[in-house]
Amino acid sequence: MKRTKTSKAWMQEHVNDPYVQRAKSEGYRSRAAFKLIELDDRDRLMRSGMVVVDLGAAPGSWSQVALRRVGREGRVFALDLLPLDPLGGVEFIQGDFQEEPVLAELESRLGGLPVDVVLSDMAPNMSGIDTTDQARSIYLGELALEFAGHHLKPGGGFVVKVFQGQGFMEYRNEAAKHFHALHVRKPKASRDRSAEVYLVGVGYRGS
């Protein structure tokens, strides 16, 4: 099968992407690591000894960043619909976060541990219809925020990816109620054409 011009252009962009090259040289599984690194460097959410939950973790680059930041005394729990090659120090659950039994398994693994930081890089299966994909993204963001509301300790942090569009401001305003500060960030590693932004909640107010 011949490659299309679009696929050739994507491959060329991927090969020449400085973040892809850095990910390889620094041992990260994907360029997405540098999105979280930039966000955490700016807002200082993760520190040694913390408990972090990483939703939408595959292929594992955000969990790698979290591991490096919380150290041996911390714990990282990761969840994704897709499989994740083993990462030493990461407790992984494979399943759909939208399904109650999967959520129950994650909560069982946590065993009542208060969580310092909830990360969500979850994205919907893309349909190619912008309004549909954006609505699904907001829904996943709502689920992540609900989980954070049940498990974050007071003062905890929250990072969630959502797509801009209809419903974004309503979601942002709802999230802002739960944190002392809420920032909208677009890391340098995010592609310019992408509708994704990250909401960073600092200082969870408690339920």
Curated annotation (Swiss-Prot):
Quote the subcellular location field of this record. Cytoplasm
Name the positions where S-adenosyl-L-methionine binds.
60, 62, 80, 96, 121
UniProt keywords (A-Z) are: Cytoplasm, Methyltransferase, rRNA processing, S-adenosyl-L-methionine, Transferase
Q: Which Gene3D superfamilies match?
A: Vaccinia Virus protein VP39
Which first-to-last residue range defines the signal peptide? none
- Enzyme Commission number, as recorded: 2.1.1.166
* Cellular component terms per the entry's GO annotation: cytoplasm
Per the entry, what this protein does is:
Specifically methylates the uridine in position 2552 of 23S rRNA at the 2'-O position of the ribose in the fully assembled 50S ribosomal subunit.
Spell out the protein name for this chain: Ribosomal RNA large subunit methyltransferase E
Q: Which organism is it from?
A: Aromatoleum aromaticum (strain DSM 19018 / LMG 30748 / EbN1) (Azoarcus sp. (strain EbN1))
What gene makes this protein?
rlmE
